[in-house]
From Swiss-Prot:
This is DNA ligase. Residues 605-685 form the BRCT domain. SUPFAM superfamilies: BRCT domain, DNA ligase/mRNA capping enzyme, catalytic domain, Nucleic acid-binding proteins, RuvA domain 2-like. The gene is ligA. DNA ligase that catalyzes the formation of phosphodiester linkages between 5'-phosphoryl and 3'-hydroxyl groups in double-stranded DNA using NAD as a coenzyme and as the energy source for the reaction. It is essential for DNA replication and repair of damaged DNA. It comes from Shewanella baltica (strain OS185). The active site is at residue 127. Zn(2+) binds at residues 422, 425, 440, 446.
């Protein structure tokens, strides 16, 4: 049957009337053979037969270019080069994973999980050392692909992803959702990496350090033809957004991966479900033992709670799911010489000793520096300049000195002496009782702190001054145009033309961006101040709780600990920050310069009749979009969750409500339709 079909595709006469039909049949056949080869590992035609089909399709597309379809396999070869990558906002955030570095870490994770949901099984898979990618299919056709980026916004790499032969341009079958997001890892197999470096070596070009860097660099090529020549691969590891959300999906992570495979997406053959903790450890040890024999680089294994309902009950923290963890392999280690120690001053004034090492190749990169953290760490290691040290790449990323080799210590070895004065500004270095970190007391007077503080202040997640990059900030400070954050708002376009490579047009645009940044939010402003351990989420919680800067400025430690996710340590940092006169002077100067934000109205108890309740939205709402409905419910005090549980107070069911409605009815949860929701919102408007 297959031979007859193949012969027909290769021999059928083509006319303008039947060209579209023949070309679609060729595309469909080639796509199916790609899946059989890359996903099923069961090719049904020879390479030469595949090439003949491809050549026939290419010839027909040359004759009838207006009939080329989006899922044609010829579209993998790469098109015109791009000028830049567009930004894509993910439909839902692409979170990272927490790490476990030993059995104690994993055991603690396991206890947190089982304390919350009881006994669990884990879906275990190798942690590929590549680049996280989101791929969106609409009606089964690949529509767009993006990098993870910062988790919320990534780069559009659609044309490059289309060149990866193992990724289907059109999904197999017809049981997939109308819209489905597939998340996975793009990587470069070891053999492809070696071949790439062999070609570079032959041309006397720069070599790639490791497959991960090669994969990342290949995916971020503006010319997709370069990507097409790099032999990248892809494994799917999760479903993302699915629409409609009523579409039936498997109830376990492992079964959902099998669904992805049935649609033609490649998944790792090393995936395994482990019901017992001992099986998880055995799986980890087995993969670790075979690490060097695998066709691709890995840096650990990922353990995910297999049951989707349990995943939903566990939920997420700010940047990672509570139901998954990356169990990292022991880092690779090498010995080298400690040649000296430099002291660096960070944005918060932390004075950090940095070891200067005789360069050594470890964990795939050449390491010449490593942090020594603080004086306590130096004392713990008993380390001296001139020692032979053991260097490790912790988590295969951050170089770390883990020990010295005492028997190799020379007589000329010298003690490491912490400076009494800041190496940048000369201010006294202080170490507060109970803190391991020594800090420069110079505050924003210290140039090192000033640069980093203003870089942070202008960054995208802070005041988001478009065009105010690190190099611009450094020049502004070096040329003494800016000494504090408030000075940014005194800059004029003509002043900024003094900067290197800053013409009047660029300076005018930057001046406009600075003016626009005056209008912000209280949460962004608090984050921009660079208060120790106050990240985006904490800044947002502080803003929501106190509603005004004046209230926050006078808050006590006790009042601060009442804020969600603010513990005693963070509360002390916040209180200490607002107790410093110099910090208050900077804040007052910023407000005087015109920085402002809309007032946050603290809701009264009467205005929040749903306070303490948990609501869930499902199905299609016709008169109100879901984001608006969620925002209005939250304004009434409700917590809006993504899944139904026994703790759910009410489910709002729109059209085509599916499994969430069934579960709510099973649990006896109150169900409300859209009209009832609108009536509730109107009554509380």
């Amino acid at each position: 049957m297959q031979d007859i079909q193949l012969d027909t595709l290769l021999s059928e006469d083509v006319t303008p009337e039947n060209a579209s039909q023949v070309m679609q049949a060729l595309s469909q056949s080639l796509n199916e053979h790609n899946i059989r080869y890359y996903v099923d590992d069961a090719p049904s035609i020879t390479d030469s037969e595949y090439d003949r089909l491809m050549q026939r399709l290419l010839k027909l597309e040359a004759l009838y270019p207006h009939l080329i379809v989006a899922d044609s396999p010829t579209q993998r070869v790469g098109g015109l080069a791009l000028a830049k990558f567009d930004q894509i906002t993910h439909l839902k955030p692409m979170l990272s994973l927490d790490n476990a570095f030993d059995e104690a870490d994993f055991s603690a994770f396991h206890k947190r999980v089982t304390d919350k949901v009881g006994e669990v099984s884990f879906c275990c898979e190798p942690k590929l050392d590549g680049l996280a990618v989101s791929i969106l299919y609409r009606h089964g056709v690949l529509e767009r692909a993006a990098t993870r980026g910062d988790g919320s916004v990534g780069e559009d790499i659609t044309e490059n992803v289309k060149t990866i032969k193992s990724i289907p341009l059109k999904l197999r079958g017809n049981d997939f959702p109308e819209l489905v997001e597939v998340r996975g890892e793009a990587f470069m197999p070891k053999a492809a990496f070696e071949a790439l470096n062999d070609r570079a070596r032959a041309k006397d070009e720069k070599l790639f350090v490791n497959p991960r860097n090669a994969a990342a660099g290949s995916l971020r090529q503006l010319d997709s033809k370069i990507t097409a020549a790099r032999s990248l691969a892809f494994y799917a590891y999760a479903l993302g957004v699915v629409e409609p959300d009523s579409h039936p999906l498997a109830k376990t992570h492992f079964e959902q991966l099998q669904q992805l495979k049935s649609w033609g997406l490649p998944i790792s053959s090393e995936i395994k479900v482990c019901a017992e903790l001992s099986q998880v450890y055995d799986y980890y040890k087995n993969i670790l033992t075979r690490r060097s024999d695998l066709a691709f680089e890995i840096d650990g294994v990922v353990m995910k709670v297999n049951d989707i309902a349990q995943q939903q009950r566990l939920g997420f923290v700010a940047k990672s799911p509570r139901w998954a963890i990356a169990y990292k392999f022991p880092a690779q280690e090498e010995m080298t010489l400690l040649e000296g120690v430099d002291f660096q001053v960070g944005r918060t004034g932390a004075v950090t000793p940095v070891a200067r090492l005789k360069p050594v190749f470890v964990g795939g990169v050449t390491v010449s520096n490593a942090t020594l953290h603080n004086a306590d760490e130096i004392a713990r290691l008993g380390i001296k300049v001139g020692d032979t040290v053991i260097i490790r790449r912790a988590g295969d990323v951050i170089p770390q000195i883990v020990a010295i080799v005492p028997e190799r210590r020379p007589e000329t070895a010298t003690d490491i002496v912490f400076p009494h004065n800041c190496p940048v500004c000369g201010s006294l270095v202080e170490r507060l009782e109970g803190e391991a970190v020594a800090r420069c007391s110079g505050g924003l007077f210290c140039e090192a702190q000033r640069k980093e503080a203003i870089k942070h202040f202008a960054s995208r997640k802070a005041l988001d001054i478009d065009g105010m990059g690190d190099k611009v900030v450094e020049q502004l400070i070096d040329k003494e145009l800016v000494q504090s954050p408030a000075d940014l708002f005194k800059l004029t376009a003509s002043m900024m033309t003094m900067l290197d490579r800053m013409g009047m047009k660029s300076a005018t645009n930057l001046a406009a961006a600075i003016e626009a940044a005056k209008t912000t939010t209280l949460a962004r402003f608090l984050y921009a101040l660079g208060i120790r351990e106050v990240g985006e989420a904490t800044a947002a919680n502080l803003a929501a709780h106190f509603a005004s800067l004046d209230a926050l400025r006078v808050a006590t430690v006790e009042q601060l600990t009442e804020v969600e996710d603010v513990g005693a340590v963070v509360a002390q940092h916040v209180a200490h920050f607002f107790a410093q006169p110099h910090n208050l002077e900077v804040i007052d100067a910023l407000i005087a310069a015109g920085v402002h934000w809309p007032a946050i109205e603290a809701p009264s108890a009467d205005a929040q009749p749903l306070k303490g309740q948990t609501w869930v939205l499902t199905g299609t709402l016709n008169q109100l979009n879901r984001n608006d409905a969620k925002a209005q419910l939250q304004a009434l005090g409700a917590k809006v969750a993504g899944s139904v549980s026994k703790n759910t107070d009410c489910l709002v069911a729109g059209e085509a409500a599916g499994s969430k409605l069934a579960k709510a009815q099973e649990l006896g949860v109150k169900v409300m339709d859209e009209d009832e929701l609108l009536a509730l919102l109107a009554a509380n408007a």
